[in-house]
Structure formats: structure tokens, C-alpha cells
Amino acid sequence: MEPAGLEQILKELLLPDTERIRRATEQLQTILRDPAALPALFDLLATATDSQIRQFAAVLTRRRLNNRWRRLAPEQRESLKSLVLTALQKETVHSVSVSLAQLSATIFRKEGLQGWPQFMNLLQHSTHSSHSPEKEVGLLLLSVVVSSQPEAFHAHQHELLQLLNETLSDVSFPGVLFYSLRTLTAIARYVRPDDVSLARMLVPKVVTALRTLIPLDEVKACEALEALDEMLETELPIINPHLSEVLTFCLEVAKNVALGEPLRVRVLCCLTFLVKVKSKALLKNRLVPPLLHALFPLMAAEPPMGQLDPEDQDSDDDDLEIGLMGETPKHFAVQVVDMLALHLPPEKLCPHVMPMLEEALRSEDPYQRKAGFLVLAVLSDGAGDHIRQRLLYPLLQIVCKGLDDPSQIVRNAALFALGQFSENLQPHISSYSEEVMPLLLSYLKSVPMGNTHHLAKACYALENFVENLGPKVQPYLPELMECMLQPLKNPSKARTKELAVSAIGAIATAAQDSLLPYFPTIMDLLREFLLTGHEDFHLVQIQSLETLGVLARALGESMKPLAEECCQLGLGLCIHIDDPDVRRCTYSLFAALSGLMGEGLGPYLPQITTLMLLSLRSTEGIVPQYDGISSFLLFDDDSEAEEEEELMDEDMEEEGDDSEISGYSVENAFFDEKEDTCTALGEISMNTCVAFLPFMDATFDEVYKLLECPHMNVRKSAYEALGQFCCALHKASQRSSSDPSSSPVLQTSLARVMPAYMQAVKVERERPVVMAVLESLTGVLRTCGSLALQPPGRLSELCNVLKAVLQKKTACQDAEEDDDEDDDQAEYDAMLLEHAGEAIPVLAATAGGHAFAPFFATFLPLLLCKTKQSCTVAEKSFAVGTLAESIQGLGTASAQFVSRLFPVLLNNAREADPEVRSNAIFGLGVLAEHGGCPAQDHFPKLLGLLLPLLARERHDRVRDNICGALARVLMASPVGKTEPQVLATLLRALPLKEDMEEWLTIGHLFSFLHQNNPEQVVDVASELLRICSLILPDNRIPPDTKAALLLLLTFLAKQHTDSFHTALGSLPNDKAQELQAMMGLT
């Protein structure tokens, strides 16, 4: 085919005439099937006079070669390689140079360094050229090729860093700077430790280069900022010596209102990431105050004259109704503060932020006050524990006062803050319901039902507060339900109905069975919404599905008669409505129903799992982002015959190789769908057990693939579901066989899941994912027991992983700084350690005390160092609690650790904080129980602590733990050494008030007394009868405890009749008669 004929067709495609473009497209698709078309394209990319035709030819050539390179004759390959390099050197139009560089990258991937030495020669020559346009082309080519195949350049990292140190030194040529930064973006993550000093030299040059690019091209500057992100993300401390300079640059750009918002937002995103990965370095270099001083004016910025922030506009856009949905510098500045709260110790952040916060809230400027409430909202997320313990009431009063602010924008922010407080400060905030609920109800009634924008904000705060109230919601239930049912029964906007349906779900979560009087009305309304075909009600339908699932969980058995109808409703909607949110909410409904129906859901599982597997596999919503011109995608000209031929070709090249795709964007709804699908599958597998087995293999494989998903929440949900699958398989194997170890499916699943969990803890960068993995790991160990510790060596691997978390040596922990000078940690860090700590006692119980003891010895110093006087309350509580539960798991093997544990637990039993005291006393009790002779030596000192403490202790849980500890001491005391006054003191302190689990211990004591020395209870008969009369009607007391006490009393009645009847006489008549009847003495 002649180049001129092909060129004419390509020209037709550039005309603004739809019909001519259609005909030319058909011609082109036909021509490109002819092998002779390729040489014509080669000729055009080098010689066509029109730059658009040259670019067209380069892109089409690249797409043709993706799967056909090896089919070209060797001389054709060599000819094209030479032609492309020549064309690159001659080309003067930048867009064509980019396409030629991309074509070169495709060829390079096929040939490699060895197969194309001329390419490396050109790179070497052009990137070091003194002629700037030639150097720019060389760096363009380098950036594209290194991005395309970074592993090919690993051996040349040092030379590349040296080159970039040179090219970034001259700020005269923006193109050279831009492509130098793009190259750095591609190689930064591969920098080796011995090149750190060279990489550090680049940081000031990167900042200077960015400063040079910003006034010239903000779009390119945004793209070039990725180099900074990559340098921050590497585990090596490249940025640290220049952290102040980088921070100053970012803040300068963020504050500069003359610059475009996309660039300022992009820089604030970079700052957010910097805070996340360099929080300790920020503290060490005293950079937090200047950062906050720069952020507050950004957060308080007033929008342009006559405008409002997006979330304050009376817009019909539901996404802007609640919280921080805007894409402005203001909203991203708040996110930086959120990240500071998550990653800095509150003791270090709050002294800096609180004075600025108070000043903002006192300001006459409503935007200053708004900023104050937004900061309060995000502080409750990262510094929640600190606020709960020290600041909750005064801050809550400030927020409540904000609901009466004269400015609507401030009231909006106060509602958002109250919603965040309600979400993050549980359970403490619920104790203020008598103050908060009347305010919220009053505010809700003051908003006109038609004003859905403000109504949404009020409902957000109300829902978050109400759903955690439990029984405390009952006084407000009639008023709440009247508010919610009124717009549902009467004509109102669809959005108003959606908000009311959502609020009913939150109310149901709190009210539980108290909602039953309203249930028939609610169900009639939800049915109506779910069966309507009206398009305006689509979002009401979605919310109705979600609320139906909440009702199934809240009302339990009362909902059971409707379970099958709900199942059919959900399936019908999924089949007839193609919408990710409908599917997501339906799957959550199925999960809730599985809790009611159990294996009764079995007949529906084929349809349910088919739908869910389609959701897991779907690539819907995933949109490729192309570097080239999108119209070139029209010419994906492989005919069906060619595709079949390629499938048969043994030498077929990689299918997925498309250098035109620069990345993917995914609509959030589809990520949410995958996340909720995983969550629902995990729950359904647990609840339906054996009925789920036929679907286990397919669902397991699809969920496992999502461990590689780029979206954090999907990965988190996938890890959780895999753990639930293992637990479900264990449960099913117990049902079908007495020995779960005989289940090959369970063994295979554990063999895949446990290594995946350990790998995730080590390399996953997102803390919420790691916390979920640790929690799931603990659950699998607890359920599957020793099977989860196969093969041999697994116990050691698991202990090493947990130890890495405690030592802050995992990828998600900021541990590159020295921690010696400061033991404070962010609450987010502490939560991660707690999740690891919870696995240690479970490991001990699973492995067996004697097998675990050597590993516990390595955990012990890491836990003991968190019990020092200088540690925070949260750290002490965590460490002491972990030690206490580990002693239980170790059993008799704990005897060898008594000398190290007893003094620490004794000291912490005197702590001011009741939670620390409670944990320490529990630990002393279990150490007394299991510690054998070494522990018995400490009994006099232990009783010397516990008995006086019981007399003055005012916290119910601590008193209950003292009772449990005394019971354990009595059972563990050497025969004949039990002191009667200890037993009498213990019995006088009963019944337990809060820690009901300790009734098991008290029950064991009653059995122990009956079996070993029943005579000693004669003197305390009246106390035993008093306790019995109180606990017999209490359903919270374990039946075994009641039975053990009745046995003791029966012994008394038979062997010491006088003492028994004297004691019985001290009870009220009705109690005495009830007791005699239960003992068969009447």
C-alpha cells in the first residue's frame, strides 16, 4: 500500500465531518489488515509533512506492534528501530515527539537493553547534550521508557541519579526540568540505601524546579509534583534533611491565592501525605506550629464575593449536603489537620491547636468560627481518646452552642462536628443524651421539610447520635418516630423521604424491640418504596434496602416471618435494576437475613452467590486513562479471525501490553460494591455454614484476587472475608466430623490465608487495613485453633510478625526516627499496637502455654516497657491487659515469669486510672491461679493490697475484678492455709455489678469449696443465702454458678441444719420460701 493513499485516509479522519470520518474509519480498518500497511505507517511517521499525520502514524504503529512485533521480519524490525530514532532526533513538534517516545518504549519492552544498543547510545548522547532541545527530547524519551519498564534500569540507578543532579541544576529550560522530574518519579521508589546521599542532593533542586515550572504551566507542575510524592513514599529517609524546605514550599503554594485551585489542592494533598509518612520528623524539627499557623487562614478563607462554599449552598446536589465534600484548598487544609490528628500524639498536637481553635471560635467572622468547628470535627477522629478523657464536656458544650449560632454556615459546621463527635467519641458522649437530644429534636423541627440541604445536615448529626443511645432513646422515641413517619406518609420530596428512611434505621439500631409498635407501619411504607417503579424514588429505594437490613439486625426474631419476602424483594431489585448501589445494599440485606435464616437461606444461595460473583469480577466503572488521542481507540482493528489466529499462536506476545494506558480511574460506587460484596459474603458464609460449602471455592478465589485491589477499603474487606471463610469452613467441618483437621478444604484455605495475613502486616502501607488483618488473624486463631499454626514453624513466623508491629518495624508505621527522646505516640499508632496485642494471648492459648513460653519471653520486654510511670494511660492499659490475658493463655507455664510480672502488676494495681487498675488486678488474679509455688510466695503481699483496696474502691468493674482475684487466691492457696476472713470479705462484696464474666470464677470457687472444704462455709452461711437470693432470678448469671452455689447450700441444709435455718431466717419471707422451694426443702 502506498503511503500517500494511507495519508489521505488519515487526513479524512481529521475533518469535522461525521460521515466522512465514518467512511474513513471503515477504510482504515480494512487497510490495516493488510501486512503492507505497516511499512506505509513507518514511512508516514517519519516523512509526512502534517504533524498530526505523523503523530497518527506513530500511535497506530505502536498499537499494531503491541502484539505483532515478533511477526515482523528481522530486517523490518531493524529498519523501524533505526527509523524511530532518526525521526525522534529530527522531530520539532512536541506532541509528535511524545508519541514517538511512546513507540520507542513499546519497542524497548520487546528488545531490551541488549537488543537495541543504538537506543542506549542515543539516550546517553541526548541526555548529556549541551543543546537544550536535544537534551529535552532525550529526557522525554528517558522518562517514558523508565516509566514503562523501570526494572530494566535498576542496574543504572546511580548513573540516573547523577544525571538528574545535573539536569535539575539548570532552571533555564522548563522542558528539561519537567522530564527530569518525570524520570525521578519513575525511579524514586527504587533508590538503594547506598544512593540515599545522592538522592538527598536532589531534594532542593526538585523544589527549585517546581518553583520554576509553576508560573509557566500549572498543569505540568501538578504532574511534576508526583516526584515529591514518590520521594516521600520511599522507606528511605531521603526528604528528612530538607523537610523544612519542602514544607515551606508546599505552604507557599497552598497560601498563594493567585494560583489556580487545582495546583493548591494538589500541593495540600502532598502535604497530607507528608504528615502521614513523616509525622515524627515534623515533631522533631518543630514544624507543627508553622504548619498549623499556615493552615488556619486557609481553612477560614472566605469564598469569592457573593458565593458560598459548596457544602453551604442550597444545592440539589446530595453529595454536597454533608461534611467536607468540596474540592477547594479550604477542604484539603482541613484534611491536613485530620491527618495531623491521626498521626501525632494528642499531647503534642493539642497544645498547639487549641489556642488557635479558641481564637477562631471567638471570632466575629463566621468563616473563622466555621473553621473552628471543622477542626473540632476532625480532632474527634484522630484524638478521640484524649478528648473523651479530658475535654469531652467543655467541647460538647461549645458544639451545642454552635447549633444556635446566628450564621447558617456556622450552624452547618456545628452539626457536622456533632455528627463526628457522635461517631468518634462513643460510648462517653451518649451519657449526655438528656442535653443533646432536645437540642437536636428542636433543630430538626425548625428546618422546613422542603429544605433538604439543611435537613440532611440535621439528620446526619441526629442519626450518628441516636444509633448509639441504646435504651436511652426510649423517652424520645414517640417524638422521633412522629418526625420521621410524617414525611413518609404525606406528600414530600423524594430526598426528604430518603433522609427519614435512613433515620429510621439509626433509631431502630438503638431502640431494638421498642420499635415494634411502629414496625407494621414502617414495613408497609418500605414495601411501597421498594415496589415503585418511579425513577425519582430510586435513591429512596436504595435507602429502603439499607434500612430493611438494619431492621433485620435490630428486630431479630420479630423480622423472621418476613425474611423470605425480603429475600425475594432484594433478588427482584438486583435482577431488574442495574445499579451498583442497589446491588451493594441488597447484598447487605442478604447478610442480615442470613443471621435470621441460617441454613434456611440455602435455596436462595445459587442466585445470591451468582450475583455477588459477578460483582466481584466486574470491571464496570473502571475507565482506562490514555496518554494518546482517544479517537485512536476507534482503530482497534483486530478482526475476529485475527484474534482467533493470535490465540492459537504459541509465540503470542503479552495481551495486556498497552503503553497508551497511563492508569485507570474507578468510580467509587463500584469500589463500594466490591467492598460490601466481600463483607456480605463473609457474613453469609458464617451464618449459612454447610449450605455455603458448594459456593466456597469460587467465592474464596474471587475474594482472594481482591487483596491486590488498589482501593484500601476493598482490600480490608477482602482480608476480613477470607478470615470468615476459614472460620465458616471450621464450623462446617465440626458439623460433619468431630475432627476439623480432616478437612482438606480448610487446610488449603488456611495455607493461603495465614501467609497472606503475615505478608499484609509486614508490607501493607495503610494502617486500617493492617488493623483489620490483625483482628481477622486473631479471629481465625481463636476459631481454628492449632490448625492455623500448621505447618511447623508457623508459630514462630506469627510471633515475628506481631513483634515487628510492637517494635514499629512494619511498612505502615513511621519508625525511621529515633524514639528514645519521646515515648508519646498518636492514638492511631496505639490502636495498631492494641490489635497486635490482642493476638498474643490467643496465640498462647492456641499453641499451649509451654510451647508459647519461649516466644512470650521475647514479647515480655516490649510489653513491660509500656507499663512505665511515664507511659500514657492508654499504653499502660493496653500492656497490662495484654500481659494479664497472656498469663491466662500460658496457664501453668506462667510460673517461670512470676518474678518479672508480679512487681509490675502490683504497681499498676495502685494506678489512678480505673481501667489500668482493673486490668492489673485481673492479671494478679490469674497469676495467682496459674503461677504455682512462685506465685504463692507473694500471696501475703497480694492480700495486703486487695483487701484494703476492696474496702475503699468505688468503681464497680475494679471491685468485681478484686472479687475475682480473691476467689482465685482462695482456690490456689496451699491446703489448710485459706484464711476465713478472706472468704467472708469476698462474699460480703458480692454480688458483682459490672464484670459479669467473673461470675464464672465465683462459680468455680463455690465448686472448689464444696469439693475440698465445705465445712468452712458454715460461718458464712448467711452471706451465701443472701447472695443466692439475689442471683437466682438474674438471667445474666451463668447457670453453672447458680448450680454450684445451690450444691453448697444443700450441703449446709443437710449437714448443718441449725446454721442453715438461722441464716434462712435473716432473709425476707418471700425470698426464703422461694429458696426452699428451689432446694426442695418445702
Swiss-Prot record:
Gene3D superfamilies: Leucine-rich Repeat Variant (1.25.10.10). InterPro entries: ARM-like, ARM-type_fold, HEAT, Importin-beta_N, Importin_beta. Signal peptide: none annotated. Residues 24-90 form the Importin N-terminal domain. HEAT repeats lie at residues 348-385, 390-427, 431-471, 475-513, 896-933, 937-975. It comes from the Eukaryota. Keywords: Acetylation, Cytoplasm, Nucleus, Protein transport, Repeat, Transport. It is found in: Cytoplasm; Nucleus. One of its GO terms (cellular component) is cytoplasm. GO terms for molecular function: nuclear import signal receptor activity; nuclear localization sequence binding; small GTPase binding. PROSITE patterns: IMPORTIN_B_NT. Found in a cytosolic complex with ASF1 (ASF1A or ASF1B) and histones H3 and H4. Nuclear transport receptor that mediates nuclear import of proteins, such as histones, RPS3A, TNP2 and VDR. Serves as receptor for nuclear localization signals (NLS) in cargo substrates. Is thought to mediate docking of the importin/substrate complex to the nuclear pore complex (NPC) through binding to nucleoporin and the complex is subsequently translocated through the pore by an energy requiring, Ran-dependent mechanism. Belongs to the importin beta family. This is Importin-4.
